[in-house]
A protein has these predicted regions:
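Pol beta-like nucleotidyltransferase catalytic core
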Residues: 1-26, 33-60, 67-159
Length: 159
């Protein structure tokens, strides 16, 4: 699944780069960039915060669409007040409020043009309350410490 997911992510990034040539890339996807196509050089940052804090949007593509599984790919941008353009967890809307992310349903359905349209929109500015709510959920509900605390004081971890 991981290699297949990485292959889908690479194809999606190639399509996005074709539609948004000014995009900045960050992370392991930039290794072997000769296969991606023309784009601004990879961001020379040391931390994820440096990569996300100055941007309105971040494309976040998981390795698959497993229900109830999401990773730092959606969490890290939200914590940095950046709206994720997200493909992954098939029931992500169960965990985060509408507007706190933009979901891509199908990576094969012109993802590059979808991303180009989203970044030209005011979605980020119009949904800051939802982004704040998503941050609060990450910090105070989904994070490890609140989860352990709840497990210690409750009979039902999922209440």
């Amino acid at each position: 699944v991981t290699l297949l997911g990485h292959h889908h992510r690479l194809q999606a990034i190639q399509d996005i780069v074709n539609h948004v040539p000014d995009i900045h890339l960050y992370g392991h996807i930039t290794k072997g960039t000769e296969n991606i196509g023309p784009f601004k050089k990879p961001l020379p940052v040391r931390t994820k915060e440096e990569a996300f804090l100055k941007y309105r949007y971040a494309v976040a593509i998981e390795n698959g669409q497993t229900p109830h599984y999401f990773s730092e790919k959606i969490i890290d941008p939200i914590l940095c007040w950046t709206t994720p353009i997200y493909w992954g967890c098939s029931n992500i809307s169960k965990y985060f409020p509408k507007g706190s992310f933009v979901e891509i349903k199908d990576l094969n359905a012109g993802v590059g043009s979808q991303v180009a349209s989203i970044i030209e929109s005011q979605h980020h500015e119009e949904n800051m309350d939802a982004l704040a709510e998503a941050r609060d959920l990450i910090l105070n509900k989904y994070n490890l410490i609140p989860t352990i605390e709840k497990a210690l004081v409750s009979d039902n971890l999922w209440e």
